[in-house]
Amino acid sequence: MKVLISGSSSGIGLEVAKRFLKEGYMVIGFDLKESKIDNPFYLHYQIDIKNKEDLPDIDGDIEFIFNNAGLQNSEDDIDNNLKGAINVTEKYAFNKNIKSVLFNASASARSGDEFPLYVASKAGLVGYMKNVAIRLAPYGATCNSISLGGVLTSSNDEVIKDK
C-alpha cells in the first residue's frame, strides 16, 4: 500500500509515518521541513502544500492519504490547513486504488476555542471532508476526520503554556 502523509516531519505526522513504515508500507511524506526518517520505503518531499504547483507527480496510485499538515496561530492557517489539504486531496485522492482519506481536524472545530483562523481552517476541513466522502463513495473508499484535543507537540507549546 502506498501512503501519503502531509506534515510528516514532526509530531503526529512523524509518528504515523513511522508506524506505517514499521508495518511495511511505502510512505510518501510532505513537509516544509526536512525529514527525520531514514528508511528506503520513505520518500520525502520538502514542499509547501498550499502551492498547488509544488505538488509532485507520483508514480502509481496513492491508497491512503493522511492530511495532517497544520499551522496554528499564523496568518497562513487557512491557506495551509484548509487549502493545502484541498490541494493534496484533489490531486491524489480520486484514483481507482484509493482506499481512505483522513483529515486531522481539531476539537477546536467544534468548540470554537483557540485562535480564530485556526478554528475556521479546521471547521472548514470537517465540511470539506463530508464533500470528499460523497465524491469518494463511487470508488468504494472512505473519508473521515479526527478531532483531537490538545496533543503534546511543539505546535501546541503556546496553548499548553496558556499564553
Model regions: which residues?
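N-terminal Rossmann NAD(P)H-binding glycine-rich loop of SDR-like oxidoreductase domains
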Residues: 9, 17
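A glycine/serine/threonine-rich, flexible loop-to-helix segment
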Residues: 150-163
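Conserved NAD(P)H cofactor-binding loop of Rossmann-fold oxidoreductase domains
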Residues: 68-73
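Conserved glycine-rich Rossmann-like NAD(P)H-binding loop of the short-chain dehydrogenase/reductase
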Residues: 23-37
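Catalytic loop of short-chain dehydrogenase/reductase
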Residues: 100-124, 129-138, 150-152
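Hydrophobic structural elements of the Rossmann-like NAD(P)H-binding subdomain
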Residues: 66, 102, 143-146, 156
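Rossmann-fold cofactor-recognition segment
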Residues: 40-51
